[in-house]
A protein has these predicted regions:
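Conserved alpha/beta-hydrolase "acid-adjacent" motif
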Residues: 253-259
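Short glycine-enriched nucleophile-adjacent loop
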Residues: 131-142, 148
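Conserved HGGG/HGGXW glycine-rich cap/lid loop of the alpha/beta-hydrolase fold
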Residues: 19-93
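Flexible "cap/lid" loop of the alpha/beta hydrolase fold
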Residues: 139, 148-177
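Catalytic active-site module of serine/aspartate enzymes centered on a nucleophile-bearing elbow/loop
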Residues: 270-309
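Conserved acidic catalytic loop of the alpha/beta-hydrolase fold
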Residues: 92-100, 104-122
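Short beta-strand/loop motif that positions the catalytic acidic residue
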Residues: 240, 246-248
Length: 309
C-alpha cells in the first residue's frame, strides 16, 4: 500500500497574495516525485486512487492537489470575469480584458507547492487544462521538470483540438445546484468519456463524491478566462528540451486527439501515444496501459538524467 499523508494545506505566495493549496502525497518521499495537475473544474480526487497507486507501485512519489478556485484550495469568491469577452478578444487579436489570473499564475502555484514540499524537481503530469498548466510550467520553469506528460490536452491554438458542439454544451452549461439533480445529470459528461468503458453507476458515484467535497461552479468562469487569456504555447513548445510524453484518446470529443498530435509534433523528441477506445477520462481497464507508459517514460528520463544521455 502507498504511504498516504492525508490531505494537507500549503500556504503559498501568489499573484493575488497568499493562498492555500489543498494537496495529498502518496508513496515514499525519497522516490522521484510526480506532480499531478488537474483540469478545468476538476478536484484532486478526480485522479483515480487506483491510478495514483499504480504510479506509487512503479516507484514514484505522487502529489495531487486542487488548483485555486476548485476543491478545498483558495477560492476567489465574488471576483467577476466574462470568459466570453476574453475569448472574443483573444480570437480577434484585441487587447485581453483584465483577468484574475492566467495559466502562468496556476503554473506558479504548482511550483510554489513543490517549494513547500522541499522538492527542487518533479515529473510534471497535467490532464486537460492541467496539461496546459503543465506545459506552461515546463516552458517557464524548465529547471523544475524532470519530464513532462501532457494528457488529453492542447497547445492553446484555438483552431486545433476544439471541442465538438455537444461536448462544449455539456461542459459549459450551468450544472444543477441540487445535489441529487447534479448526480442525476452527471451521465451527460459521457459525451466525451470512453464509450466502450462507460459506467453510469461509477459516474454517478464519483459525481456524488465530488459534490460532497466541494461544489463550486463559480470558479469555472475564472479558470476558463485564464485559458483564453493565456493564448497559444506553440512557439514556446518548439523550444522545449524536456523529455515529453503526449497521451490522447481516439474517442475524446472534448479536446479531440488532433490537439495531442499537434503537441507532439511541436515538442522536439517527444513521444505520442494514441490510445484506442479512450475518451477524455481514465477508465479503469486502460489504467495499466496508461500508467505503464508513463512509468516507462519517467524511468527513461531518470536514466538519461543520471547518465547524461
Amino acid at each position: 500500500m502507498a504511504i498516504v499523508t492525508g490531505m494537507a494545506q500549503a500556504l503559498i505566495p501568489a499573484n493575488i497574495g497568499p493562498i492555500s493549496i489543498e494537496y495529498e502525497t502518496m508513496g515514499e518521499a525519497t522516490n522521484p516525485a510526480i506532480l499531478l495537475i488537474q483540469g478545468f473544474g476538476a478536484q484532486l480526487i478526480n485522479w483515480p486512487d487506483q491510478f495514483c497507486q499504480m504510479l506509487v507501485n512503479q516507484g514514484f512519489y505522487v502529489i495531487r492537489f486542487d488548483n485555486r478556485d476548485c476543491g478545498l484550495s483558495t477560492k476567489l469568491d465574488g471576483v467577476v470575469v466574462d470568459p466570453n469577452a476574453v475569448f472574443a478578444a483573444a480570437l480577434t487579436g484585441q487587447e485581453i480584458p483584465p483577468v484574475p489570473y492566467t495559466l502562468s499564475d496556476l503554473a506558479q502555484d504548482a511550483v510554489e507547492l513543490l517549494n513547500h514540499l522541499g522538492l527542487g524537481t518533479a515529473h510534471i503530469l497535467g490532464a486537460s487544462m492541467g496539461g496546459m498548466i503543465a506545459q506552461t510550467l515546463v516552458i517557464e520553469h524548465p529547471e523544475r521538470a524532470r519530464s513532462l506528460i501532457s494528457l488529453y490536452s492542447v497547445t492553446g491554438e484555438f483552431e486545433i483540438g476544439a471541442p465538438t458542439a455537444e461536448a462544449a454544451e455539456a461542459l459549459l452549461g450551468p450544472p444543477p445546484t441540487d445535489r441529487q439533480a447534479y448526480i442525476d445529470a452527471s451521465p451527460k459528461y459521457g459525451v466525451w468519456q470512453s464509450k466502450r468503458y462507460f459506467d453510469e453507476v461509477a459516474v454517478k458515484r464519483e459525481a456524488a463524491r465530488a459534490f460532497d467535497r466541494s461544489f463550486y461552479p463559480e470558479g469555472s468562469s475564472r479558470q476558463l478566462a485564464a485559458i483564453y487569456a493565456s493564448g497559444s504555447r506553440a512557439e514556446e513548445l518548439q523550444k522545449l528540451q524536456t523529455p515529453t510524453l503526449v497521451i490522447h484518446g481516439t474517442d475524446d470529443t472534448l479536446l479531440p486527439p488532433d490537439g495531442g498530435k499537434r503537441t507532439a509534433e511541436l515538442v522536439p523528441g517527444s513521444t505520442f501515444l494514441l490510445v484506442a477506445d479512450m475518451g477524455h477520462d481514465l477508465p479503469e481497464p486502460l489504467l495499466p496501459l496508461i500508467t505503464g507508459a508513463m512509468a516507462a517514460h519517467m524511468k527513461l528520463a531518470e536514466w538519461q538524467r543520471a547518465t547524461g544521455h
